[in-house]
């Protein structure tokens, strides 16, 4: 009787490479690597998995699907965990889990493995998502089971013919996709240490950024960014392009001590140039086009959605319901913003929309004023009536 098939979420790094060598004794390992826009050498990763002992190796380009179905709902909801983190890694885990489950069904695998430790959020995100999509699949976490130190991993790798990555001395743990880059470990673990320049990878230091500001126009249609400077492109390409444009101006650096799902605090360095520009630009179009009641209520749901996504509940009914509400609000979010990029700052300096609720004739203090000021007297009387009655009854 042959071995059971196992789908491994493969990154090409030391942990998941050692996992292939460890798992192949009991399973037929099928390595699956998802391209979510991190810019890795995917051909090398594909071949490396086979060299170590995977029976099959797949590279899945999911950039467009990731952008359209995961990043876009988060953008439209201004999803920022603890009002600071645009959910870079948290957004990619659901689509990775989804594709792992699809590959398990396609290949007849009964088990999925991931390379997460027992200390981070991602183990929860993967396993909760997989259980939501197919509760019959078994999930194992080799790295969590080993509890090995890095030196023990290297010893095992050398003994089992696993190639040692060239950047093994890099003290940082980095995760990247088209929505941004996350960095932790090394000197960053001490929150009193300023992050050294070497900790950043996709943004220039604001001090080294160009001395001249750059202005860009971003066009939105139904809440979706569709063009930069009138050049239309897919959402994935637009985000990747904006990462380069804004990154060279030092935009999107975030230094955050966050509350992890597993109960500890963690210091993270994020670089999210496109995300920070798009979040600011999108909010400005909403400010023009949404009625006051929606503008005031939507942030309550935005905060809840941010927590749901961070806390591994992308596939929960609550997440689905909030995303549906947000999508309904986006029908009028059409227009263009002009954004000034300069030394770490992205400032929206102009905006217009065919759905704008801003009426200059109502807002102006010039002779063109069309606001009926006589109506204010009755409005004030009725608006303040409950307060007035309370004061009369309760003496203030």
From Swiss-Prot:
Domain of life: Bacteria
Enzyme class: ligase
EC number: 6.3.4.5
Record flagged with keyword Nucleotide-binding: yes
Residues annotated for L-citrulline binding in this entry: 85, 121, 125, 173, 258, 270
Pathway(s) this gene product operates in, as recorded in its UniProt entry: Amino-acid biosynthesis; L-arginine biosynthesis; L-arginine from L-ornithine and carbamoyl phosphate: step 2/3
Entry's localization field: Cytoplasm
Reaction(s) catalysed (UniProt annotation): L-citrulline + L-aspartate + ATP = 2-(N(omega)-L-arginino)succinate + AMP + diphosphate + H(+)
Signal sequence interval, chain numbering: none
Binding residues for L-aspartate: 117, 121-122
Keyword ATP-binding appears in the UniProt entry: yes
Keywords (A to Z) from UniProt: Amino-acid biosynthesis, Arginine biosynthesis, ATP-binding, Cytoplasm, Ligase, Nucleotide-binding
GO molecular function, one term: ATP binding
GO biological process, one term: argininosuccinate metabolic process
SUPFAM superfamilies documented for this protein: Adenine nucleotide alpha hydrolases-like, Argininosuccinate synthetase, C-terminal domain
GO CC annotation terms, alphabetical: cytoplasm
InterPro entries: Arginosuc_syn_C, Arginosuc_syn_N, Arginosuc_synth, Arginosuc_synth_CS, Arginosuc_synth_type_1_subfam, AS_cat/multimer_dom_body, Rossmann-like_a/b/a_fold
Assembly information from the UniProt record: Homotetramer.
The family this protein is said to belong to: Belongs to the argininosuccinate synthase family. Type 1 subfamily.
Name of the protein in its database record: Argininosuccinate synthase
Lineage: Bacteria, Bacillati, Bacillota, Bacilli, Lactobacillales
Name of the coding gene: argG
